[in-house]
Amino acid sequence: MAGGHPERRLIVTRLTEAEKIARMAKLLSQKQGLALPRYQEIKHAAELALDMLRKSLDAFARLDVVMAAQVVRQDDQVDEEFRAIMRYLITFMMEDPRTISTSLEILFVAKAIERIGDHAKNMSEYVIYMVKGRDVRHVTVDEIDREIEL
């Protein structure tokens, strides 16, 4: 098959798509004139997700399990940002029901960012599997660190 390994092409295509989504979400959060509740948290989560994507692509290209493990660790940060945004938006909507529509749009953006982080984490777990031959999808970060040291 011309053009390289089919699995790699599939993964790179999927991550390229996710990176575009993350950039769009980041741009949306930076729009001038939009009063976005939790703007800084959304921006921070988008930056983290983009960083995770870059690192996961690099880890894949280099088969770098150390960098892949860093991405897995970062996923907790993106998840926490999402939970904080969600808690705030729920409170915001309860206090003023007129904000429900805007809050839901923001929540969808935040969830998209969180899912991008999840995809980068999955990619990084796959890198560890390719190099070490062990499925680390359902183990702790500490166990992954121990696996890498072997």
Q: Which functions belong to the PLM regions below?
A:
Residues M1-L150:
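Cytosolic, long alpha-helical scaffolding segments
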